[in-house]
Design a protein with these regions (language model features):
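Basic (Lys/Arg-enriched) interaction patch that binds polyanionic ligands
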Residues: 232-252
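Ferredoxin-type iron-sulfur electron-transfer modules in oxidoreductases and energy-metabolism complexes
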Residues: 211-233, 251-343
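General structural feature for long, well-ordered alpha-helical segments within catalytic domains
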Residues: 8-12, 241, 267, 328
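Short alpha-helical basic/polar micro-motif
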Residues: 93, 239, 243, 321
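Iron-sulfur-associated redox domains of electron-transfer enzymes in respiratory
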Residues: 1-218
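Active-site-flanking alpha-helical
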Residues: 100, 246-250, 324
Length: 343
């Protein structure tokens, strides 16, 4: 266990940035999101959650795949270069780290997504324990311990100082790179912090949600349930829930005429949009109820059934906070428990 004095935090970013890019929670106009760190950036390690998850460090909201050029009858296809620079994502919370693990299941399974794989190979995650979890948090439901994030490096902010523990080879390499700022220390204060965090988690309103019955065995029962017919009605199909979610991985692929050729890129999409699964023979999900049901069945039934019980939700609470119609995965789970829900 190491400690970095609070007056050395800026020096820490400067030292890390000497040989790698840094992505950190940056306050821009009152909103905190993960962004590339530059000298003078207002890094915010106090705000619990960024507005969007930091998943776009590995799965960008938009990325070029390749460009096609035509010269007479000759067509040249120029693939986009894969990520080859090292980078650090600093300050991820345990739920968002688990979100990356979910993305790994999707993009690192065969056929491997080479763009995602290149970023994962180059990226080091420095996670920050949640000092004071909020009422919308329910990561405990999915087996996540926000007091002890499982990343390359786990850190804790205690009394303004940063406590640092490397957990992987990547973490050890980064630890060596910043060794001049580290002071060896015991873990007494960190253990006390963990105890305090876990005590808060136990009192959160959604910490003891039951996932009983949400598995592959319940597919037909849940799919055919009349609960969906009423539950979906407030949905505006805005897609906000999918864009702030750490685990949503749906994307579209589009072509853009640059004037000098055609650029193919992919960008995030949303299963809540009417044209998401549109096909030539018209077999897309035609109603908002079907799309709403698909989103939550995927997270709670289909994904765990196909991925060794891993749910495609990490309990970050962003959908609880951001949905303009107060619809979210908590309300879905509670509706099937016949418990209602006030959010």
């Amino acid at each position: 266990m190491y400690k970095i004095a609070k007056e050395n935090l800026t020096a820490l970013f400067q030292l890390m940035a000497a040989e790698r890019d840094i992505y950190a929670p940056v306050n821009n106009g009152g909103q905190v999101n993960f962004a590339a760190w530059t000298e003078g950036a207002e890094v915010d390690l106090d705000t619990l959650k960024s507005v969007k998850s930091p998943k776009d460090a590995f799965f960008p909201q938009s990325e070029n795949l390749y460009t096609c050029y035509k010269d007479g009858k000759k067509i040249t296809i120029q693939p986009e270069e894969l990520r080859h620079e090292d980078f650090v994502v600093f300050g991820m919370k345990a739920c968002d780290v688990k979100g990356v693990e979910v993305l790994d299941k999707v993009f690192l399974s065969e056929p491997v997504d080479t763009f995602y794989a290149a970023r994962r190979a180059r990226g080091t995650i420095v996670a920050l324990a949640c000092h004071e979890p909020e009422e919308t948090c329910f990561c405990k439901v999915f087996g996540i311990d926000c007091a002890e994030p499982a990343a390359d490096v786990a850190t804790w902010m205690v009394e303004g100082d940063l406590y640092w523990k490397a957990l992987t080879e990547k973490g050890e390499a980064l630890t060596k790179a910043v060794a001049s700022l580290l002071t060896e220390t015991d873990d007494a204060k960190v253990e006390a912090e963990k105890t305090a965090i876990r005590a808060i988690v136990e009192k959160l309103p959604y910490s003891n949600l039951s996932l009983e019955g949400w598995n592959g065995d319940a597919l037909t029962e849940k799919f055919d349930s009349p609960v969906w017919e009423e539950l979906y009605k407030p949905c505006l199909a805005c897609g906000t829930c999918t864009f702030v979610c750490p685990t949503c991985q749906c994307y579209d692929i589009k072509d853009y005429d640059t004037g000098h050729g055609v650029q193919r890129y992919r960008c995030w999409d949303s299963c809540m949009y009417s044209d998401f699964t549109m096909m030539a023979h018209g077999n897309n999900r035609t109603s908002q109820m079907q799309r709403f049901r698909q989103r939550f069945m995927h997270k709670l039934v289909y994904f765990p059934a196909n991925n060794d019980g891993m749910y495609s939700c990490v309990g970050c609470g962003r959908c609880v906070e951001k949905c303009p119609a107060s619809l979210n995965i908590v309300k879905v789970i509670k509706a099937f428990e016949n418990q209602g829900g006030d959010r």
